Amino acid sequence: MISLSHFLVLGGVLFAIAVLGIFLNRKNVIVLLMAIELMLLAVNMNFIAFSHYLGDVHGQVFVFFILTVAAAESAIGLAILVLLFRNLRTINVDDLDQLKG
């Protein structure tokens, strides 16, 4: 049987991979967005695991709120990314330091 510690270790490993993805690759916006989504996935796994093992539904309801925020974040982030690529022809974070008003 899979215990709570297995789920928590898996969530911790996913979160650590996401943090490494952010720190090791600060150039590409798409990789940064994917790492943030992986962080949210790790947090959701921990909420689901605690909710299941405690017999409480509040953690599962909270996961639905996190999923809606993550979907909105992804949609807005990718829309901004498409506009930046159309205007600047790059998605490199270092090239996105120009302010135009």
From Swiss-Prot:
Molecular-function annotations in GO: NADH:ubiquinone reductase (non-electrogenic) activity; quinone binding
Gene3D superfamilies documented for this protein: 1.10.287.3510
Keywords, ordered alphabetically: Cell inner membrane, Cell membrane, Membrane, NAD, Quinone, Translocase, Transmembrane, Transmembrane helix, Transport, Ubiquinone
Membrane topology of the entry: Multi-pass membrane protein
Catalysed transformations (reactions): a quinone + NADH + 5 H(+)(in) = a quinol + NAD(+) + 4 H(+)(out)
Main location (coarse class): membrane
EC identifiers of the protein: 7.1.1.-
Subcellular localization(s) per the UniProt record: Cell inner membrane
One GO term describing the cellular component: NADH dehydrogenase complex
Coiled coil: none
InterPro entries in UniProt: NADH_UbQ_OxRdtase_chain4L/K, NUOK/Mnh_C1-like
Presence of keyword Membrane: yes
Transmembrane segments: 4-24, 30-50, 61-81
Family: Belongs to the complex I subunit 4L family.
Entry function: NDH-1 shuttles electrons from NADH, via FMN and iron-sulfur (Fe-S) centers, to quinones in the respiratory chain. The immediate electron acceptor for the enzyme in this species is believed to be ubiquinone. Couples the redox reaction to proton translocation (for every two electrons transferred, four hydrogen ions are translocated across the cytoplasmic membrane), and thus conserves the redox energy in a proton gradient.
Assembly, per entry: NDH-1 is composed of 14 different subunits. Subunits NuoA, H, J, K, L, M, N constitute the membrane sector of the complex.
Name of this chain's protein: NADH-quinone oxidoreductase subunit K
Species assigned in the record: Thiobacillus denitrificans (strain ATCC 25259 / T1)
